[in-house]
Amino acid sequence: MSAIVDIIGREIIDSRGNPTVECDVLLESGVMGRASVPSGASTGSREAIELRDGDKNRYFGKGVLKACENINTEISEAIMGLDANEQAFLDRTLIDLDGTDNKARLGANATLAVSMAVAKAAAEESGLPLYRYFGGSGAMQMPVPMMNVINGGAHANNNLDLQEFMIIPVGAPSFREAIRYGAEVFHTLKKIINDKGLPTSVGDEGGFAPSVENHEAAIKMILQAIEQAGYEPGTQIALGLDCAASEFYKDGKYHLAGEGMSLSSADFTNLLGTWCDKYPIISIEDGMAENDWDGWATLTNALGKKVQLVGDDLFVTNTKILREGIQKNVANSILIKINQIGTLTETFAAIEMAKRAGYTAVISHRSGETEDSTIADIAVGTNSLQIKTGSMSRSDRMAKYNQLLRIEEDLGDIASYPGRNAFYNLK
């Protein structure tokens, strides 16, 4: 019997030194599942609510004791004795118990920690690796990593408005080799930055955060690193951007302070299109602000056939919003962040909806992470084909990459690395 007999919520510390929630779930058999939740810096306004204590005298208001208390009291009472194998029923119980549209009462950080811990306990008891528990025998596709090697925006203290500049090893023959490609480019880029007399300190997600002349200078620096590392830009390693455009969208304009520009949606689309013509960029995340749906339509019409356009702040892993985007033909991909919605069942529903509509689903970390590697198992278990989990530094990022390396080893000969085929939305 997989009955839940004990639940413990506790406050731990994330990769930015801020409190976050960890949960242990104990089953009648003696098996335990443990999970901890991430936290974002640039967040969509329609994300599920992360419950913080608000006590300015403790962690500057960022404590999560209330969320932990909710786990240890109300949530515990509601799910004690339930079967851990009934994930959908358990998650529905959490959703109904909270009673709000955005987990504002109990906190998405509380519900997600419980949802994940239950799944991990159930997988452990069944004797299955977590990815296999999620995906059954069909889970065999490794994800293409999108590695954030230069940080800007809310993730760094430099003059870059765009938040992430990523390398994507589309030409690698396996996930293991994709990691090697990325690591070698990362170390080459570090030397290039150092040789320019710029600091090689890293941002929240493990990428470098140099102050360079402008955004194109950052792109050219990455291309130089790719070539010096012995790879061919475009064919072996492509580029991706996360604009996080909501962060610099004000009064109907996109204000690129580092460029000295203030652009309309159409002009910003043209700028992005110019970059895509000049450089091997195959993915742009949040290229328009979350509330600028007309701008998203313009961007999708202009670039949607040749560039993956990922909605993060736009869709916030929410099926209601994603459905609207699909109906309006806005974007062609969704970023999946488990803490944006607050349960595994709702996360899997968003992935499934995207796939059925021909959209890709990119599994993603947050800028504030822990050693929890559940998203690696989600990526393989759901055959999502793409993952975004940082650069080639910081152990909170390596935890996910290393788990994926273990999964690929476990899969053996049936492991498949899709490479450029991961971008099936561009065919």
UniProtKB/Swiss-Prot annotation:
GO biological process, alphabetically ordered: glycolytic process
Reactions mediated catalytically: (2R)-2-phosphoglycerate = phosphoenolpyruvate + H2O
Pathway of action: Carbohydrate degradation; glycolysis; pyruvate from D-glyceraldehyde 3-phosphate: step 4/5
Residues at which (2R)-2-phosphoglycerate binds: 163, 337, 366-367, 388
Protein name: Enolase
EC number: 4.2.1.11
Note describing how the cofactor binds: Binds a second Mg(2+) ion via substrate during catalysis.
Cofactor (UniProt): Mg(2+)
Keyword Membrane: no
Biological role: Catalyzes the reversible conversion of 2-phosphoglycerate (2-PG) into phosphoenolpyruvate (PEP). It is essential for the degradation of carbohydrates via glycolysis.
PANTHER family: ENOLASE
GO CC entries: cell surface; extracellular region; phosphopyruvate hydratase complex
Subcellular location: Cytoplasm; Secreted; Cell surface
Alphabetical list of InterPro entries matching this protein: Enolase (IPR000941), Enolase-like_C_sf (IPR036849), Enolase-like_N (IPR029017), Enolase_C (IPR020810), Enolase_CS (IPR020809), Enolase_N (IPR020811)
Keyword annotations of the record: Cytoplasm, Glycolysis, Lyase, Magnesium, Metal-binding, Secreted
Active site: 205, 337
Entries under CDD domains matching the protein: enolase (cd03313)
SUPFAM superfamilies xrefs: Enolase C-terminal domain-like, Enolase N-terminal domain-like
One Pfam family linked to the record: Enolase_C
Stored SMART domains: Enolase_C (SM01192), Enolase_N (SM01193)
Natural source organism: Herminiimonas arsenicoxydans
